[in-house]
């Protein structure tokens, strides 16, 4: 009898403890702040070489215009609207967990980052933490930018400081409650020195370039809202927008469904396919040719970088995955 009474008391306590534990856990998840570190006190020196490197990163490799500049997606490749570089605005991807806005990153002191220190800008780029300490939604690819070398992130900041200031108030993103809690673990402060990668490192240098450019992020399909790591670079991630729906391509070395049969010349020509449209004369397109792939930016990748990226992609695991880029529309061959 005593054993039975003790067992009943034990299970009763357990039943009381479980909801208390769940409530405490939920409260912790709600009130906890994302990991962050104080911004560095660095002051980036403005040199012509650094600004030029930053321009290459901003406009080409990292394609910052893709989110932070107004673009015309009724035209092939979504060319940037003149005079709109860095002004920010609402992201037009469907299926996002709320209203997501890309901030104004011009030097405007009231609506942009003109009053931010260089250290605060670097922290936002690599750590995903804004000037006031709030977390940036990780549609901003700072999980990849945390690998930017110190000299590259300083170059990026230097170029941003040269942009014309645009007065354009952009509201803060409004994310669903559950998702806002789940993504709090994404920011990881960069607290170490990150040296430059040897530009003559072949596929190792290519891995650095592909990582900060976010190739894997777009070219890996998702499963239940998370990247399917078993299908890295295999394409098939769905991007739905007001202008059309497009699926990312398979860029693994699979010979039938990826780029396994491509040589470097074909890869280079594909990346530079927008060069034929001079003076921003990009044709009007419908959903059958809509693309989010930043060909307009990548046409300016230098041969050395492009070849390194190609070597890296060719070294990945080949995955058979046939992708129809524009569902419901006939495929347009290269």
Predicted regions, residues:
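N-terminal type II signal-anchor transmembrane helix
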Residues: 2-38
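Electrostatic cytochrome c docking/interface patches
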Residues: 36-59, 183-211, 257-259
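The canonical Cys-X-X-Cys-His
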Residues: 54, 61-71, 121, 156, ...
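Extracytoplasmic/periplasmic/luminal assembly and interaction segments
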Residues: 57-99
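Detector for the c-type heme attachment site
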Residues: 67-73, 126, 141, 161-162, ...
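Electron-transfer interface patches adjacent to heme c in soluble/periplasmic c-type cytochromes
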Residues: 85-120, 143-153, 232-278, 295-306
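A cross-kingdom feature marking solvent-exposed beta-strand/loop segments within repeated
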Residues: 132-148, 277-300, 321-322
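Extended surface/linker regions that mediate inter-domain or inter-protein docking
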Residues: 141-143, 147-205, 305-312
């Amino acid at each position: 009898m005593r054993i039975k009474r003790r067992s009943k008391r034990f299970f009763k306590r357990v039943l009381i403890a479980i909801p208390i534990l769940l409530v405490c856990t939920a409260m912790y998840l709600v009130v906890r702040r994302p990991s962050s570190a104080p911004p560095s006190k660095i002051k980036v020196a403005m040199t012509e070489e650094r600004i030029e490197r930053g321009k290459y990163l901003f406009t080409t490799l990292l394609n910052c215009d893709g989110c932070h500049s107004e673009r015309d997606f009724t035209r092939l490749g979504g060319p940037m609207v003149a005079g709109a570089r860095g002004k920010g605005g609402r992201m037009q991807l469907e299926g996002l967990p709320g209203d997501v806005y890309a901030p104004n990153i011009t030097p405007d002191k009231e609506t942009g980052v003109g009053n931010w220190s260089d250290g605060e800008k670097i922290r936002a780029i690599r750590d995903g933490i804004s000037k006031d300490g709030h977390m940036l939604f990780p549609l901003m690819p700072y999980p990849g930018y945390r690998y930017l070398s110190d000299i590259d992130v300083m170059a990026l900041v230097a170029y941003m400081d040269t942009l014309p200031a645009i007065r354009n108030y952009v509201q803060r993103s409004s994310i669903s409650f559950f998702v806002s809690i789940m993504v709090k673990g994404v920011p990881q402060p960069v607290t170490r020195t990150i040296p430059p990668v040897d530009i003559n490192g072949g596929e190792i240098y290519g891995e650095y370039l592909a990582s900060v450019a976010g190739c894997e992020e777009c070219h890996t399909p998702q499963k239940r809202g998370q990247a399917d790591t078993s299908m890295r670079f295999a394409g098939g991630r769905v991007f739905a927008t007001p202008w059309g729906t497009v699926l990312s391509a398979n860029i693994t070395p699979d010979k039938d469904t990826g780029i396994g049969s491509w040589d470097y010349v074909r890869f280079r020509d594909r990346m530079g396919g927008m060069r034929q449209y001079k003076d921003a004369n990009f044709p009007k397109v419908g959903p059958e040719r809509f693309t989010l792939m930043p060909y307009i930016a990548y046409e300016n990748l230098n041969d050395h970088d492009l070849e390194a990226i190609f070597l890296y992609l060719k070294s990945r695991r080949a995955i058979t995955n046939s992708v129809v880029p524009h569902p419901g529309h006939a495929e347009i061959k290269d």
